[in-house]
């Protein structure tokens, strides 16, 4: 018999697989069947579908070691270093979660739970963007005509999955080229002229 934690892990792994394969069998009853438990048992662990999808995205982050990926950014000695490391961490993560992101984005228009899960993930990215902007501002290198909110909006928009898709999938940029160009664009958009590499 599986422990509660083992069951939760199995539920999250199964939900992840369902999302990545873009299966339309993603209702709570479908997930329960795929896991091999009753729907009632699934609801004991995750009372709502939104909670299940959000927990799944957080599980993916844990498995993919997102916190470790962000360590360089969080420990950076300057705002510009933080910006660079954050863009590399965030941009480098997109290809690994792309299948799941496509599924949630496709479902969100007609699926409140999927929309909530996707929005929660995007707010986490926005929080990282805001931290990078604050570090740049603290160093006195943020463009004087940008507020923290506007600068965060700009960086958050640059780092969207949709932009990655356009440049890497449609325009066939390499992942490395994408990350380098996003850093360059972020510097142009956010930093006072002449302060990029100081």
Indicate residue ranges for each PLM-predicted region.
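Short helix-capping/turn signature of helix-turn-helix
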Residues: 46, 106-111
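Amphipathic alpha-helical packing segments from all-alpha helical-bundle domains
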Residues: 92-105, 113-139, 149-153, 187-188
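N-terminal intrinsically disordered/low-complexity leader segments
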Residues: 1-6, 198
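Short, basic, alpha-helical segments at the C-terminal edge of helix-turn-helix-like DNA-binding modules
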Residues: 28, 57-65
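Hydrophobic alpha-helical connector segments
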Residues: 68-96, 152
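Helix-turn-helix
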Residues: 10, 14, 18-51, 55
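Hydrophobic/aromatic-rich alpha-helical bundle segments in the mid-to-C-terminal region
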Residues: 137-185, 193-198
């Amino acid at each position: 018999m599986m422990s509660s934690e083992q069951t939760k892990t199995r539920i999250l792994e199964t939900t992840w697989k369902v999302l990545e394969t873009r299966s339309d069998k993603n209702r709570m009853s479908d997930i329960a069947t795929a896991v091999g438990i009753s729907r009632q048992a699934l609801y004991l662990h995750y009372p709502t579908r939104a909670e299940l999808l959000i927990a799944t995205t957080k599980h993916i982050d844990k498995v993919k070691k997102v916190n470790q990926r962000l360590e360089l950014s969080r420990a950076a000695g300057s705002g510009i270093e933080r910006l660079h490391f954050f863009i590399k961490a965030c941009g480098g993560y997109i290809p690994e979660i792309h299948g799941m992101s496509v599924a949630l984005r496709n479902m969100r228009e007609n699926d409140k739970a999927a929309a909530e899960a996707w929005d929660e993930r995007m707010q986490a990215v926005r929080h990282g963007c805001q931290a990078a902007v604050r570090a740049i501002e603290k160093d006195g290198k943020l463009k004087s005509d940008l507020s923290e909110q506007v600068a965060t909006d700009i960086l958050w928009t640059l780092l969207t999955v949709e932009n990655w898709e356009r440049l890497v999938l449609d325009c066939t940029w390499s992942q490395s080229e994408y990350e380098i160009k996003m850093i360059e664009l972020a510097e142009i958009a956010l930093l006072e002229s002449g302060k990029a590499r100081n």
